[in-house]
Amino acid sequence: MDLNFDLYMTDVVNQARNEIEEAGYEQLTSADEVDSVLKQEGTSLVMVNSVCGCAGGIARPAATHALHYDKLPDRLVTVFAGQDKEATQRARDYFEGYAPSSPSFALIKDGKVTEMIERHQIEGHDVMNVITQLQNLFDNYCVEK
């Protein structure tokens, strides 16, 4: 593999990580970290991050702007598909009934998936549409902060 490509991809991945972390999402990079968060009582929004265009152009901006709302999950976390493979696989173990998809969002309540917003509900949609989908999840499963 070309060194310039590797450096470029490292930069792209780091930018994607920083963007979602700056929005307030905690990076989970191991299966143990995923279990310690998702087994807790309450609600957790999991963003399955990726380097694809719809993650950077739609999913991450929606993940950021959806938080300007009265009802929010107790915890905001992210795993990175293709990068933190162990953490991503463990998170997907919680997404029972849903096929692997990235980018995507899962709302976990008391250790169980309630609903997901899958890639096909993100790709080809505008940011506002995904924000609305996220805030609908918050309305259905979260309490006012």
UniProtKB/Swiss-Prot annotation:
GO biological process, any: cell redox homeostasis
Superkingdom, taxonomy of origin: Bacteria
Pfam families associated with the record: Disulph_isomer
UniProt record similarity statement: Belongs to the bacilliredoxin family.
Name under which the protein is recorded: Bacilliredoxin SSP1241
The organism of origin for this protein: Staphylococcus saprophyticus subsp. saprophyticus (strain ATCC 15305 / DSM 20229 / NCIMB 8711 / NCTC 7292 / S-41)
